[in-house]
Amino acid sequence: DGFHLGTITRETDVYFNSKTRDFRETDEALRLRRTENLGSGYLIADNELSDGEVEVLSEITYKGRKLDDISMSRLELSSRIVDYDDMKAILEALGYYPVTPVVKRRKYYHGEEMVACIDDVEGLGNYMELEIIVDDESKREKALGLIEKQLERLGLSMEDTTTISYLSMLERKE
């Protein structure tokens, strides 16, 4: 419904926790993500760009507490990092330790105001995320309304969605 296929990636997320600040208790997250760009559209093989090169990007993200009970809306602060291994070593030197990794193959579909991601999460299966980035809290209600309308077009409702993160789902399986 107005969406076009963008990039296809493999994302490896390593979340961190701390003995002095348990992010499970505070409903926050600290994550390092390594993203392999597998290509775009239908011009890709299973895991390679057409010339065999795989572009890899890394970023660190802090996620604040969820802002409501019906969505995954929260403050997210992200920054690209040059050296993934050095950043991981810095976090560990500061007392953070890695927890269960989340690995997924993600297809990005872009709409006018919304991005839909189809995720194949290792150990969990397939999920869809609908996301609208807002730069002002006053726009959040409108964004949730647009997501609800898109779900209805797909024969779904907000009741069919989950606010449980992939990390939490994987940890519950252990």
Give the residues covered by each predicted segment:
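A generic structural motif
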Residues: 132-138
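Short glycine-rich, acidic/polar surface loops and turns
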Residues: 113-119
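N-terminal strand-loop-strand beta-hairpin
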Residues: 1-113, 157-174
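Mixed-charge, glycine-accented linear interaction segment located at domain edges/termini
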Residues: 138-162
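Short beta-strand elements
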Residues: 34, 119-123
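Residues forming anionic-ligand binding surfaces in small-molecule and nucleic-acid pockets
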Residues: 63, 123-129
